[in-house]
Amino acid sequence: QEMMRHPRWDSISMSLHHYDVSKLSELYGCRIPEKAFDFEGIDLQKVNSSCNLVKGYIDNAEESHKMLDFNLDLGIPRVGFVALMKVNDYCREHFVDLEDIHLDSIPHVYFTKSMNRGSDCKCSNYLYNRDLKILEIYMRNYANPNYCESSLVYDGEYLRQGFHQDNIIY
C-alpha cells in the first residue's frame, strides 16, 4: 500500500480475485491481512482491479454482483473480469466462461462496446450503477495464448514472452 501512494504512478493494476479475505487467501496460498483493503491516502482513480473467474470462487452472476459491489464500496472505479487461459491443468479444471456469468442479468449493468481480433482475442466493456456511483467493467472474453506474445509473464520459475510454453526468456 505504501508503494500505491507514490505520486508518480499514472495507473495501478491490482489483482483482486475475490471479495472475501479468506477466499482470497485460499486463491493466493497465503494469509491476506484484513488491512489489505485499507486504501487511505491512495488516489483510487488510478486503480484498476482485475478479477480472474475461477470455478468455486467468482463463477456466476451472484458472485460477480458481489464483486462489483465490493469494488464500488472500496472506491475502485474500474474492475476487469478475466476468463482463465487454458494453459495448464489448474486453468482447464477451474475455467469459467464469461458467457456463463450472465453479466447482463445483473441489475444496472449496461453493455457499452466490444472489440475483437477474430479468434485471437475479444474484450467487452460495461458500466455498473449503484446509488449514483459508476463502476467501469472490462472483460477479456477470450485470448489466444500464442497471440499475446507481447506480454511478459513470470510463471514462478521462468520469465516468458506470451502465455505459451515454448518461449522462455533466460
Task: List each language-model region with its residue ranges.
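Radical SAM enzyme [4Fe-4S]-AdoMet core and its adjacent flexible, acidic
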Residues: 22-147, 155
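Alpha-helix boundary/interfacial micro-motifs
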Residues: 7-10, 32-34, 166
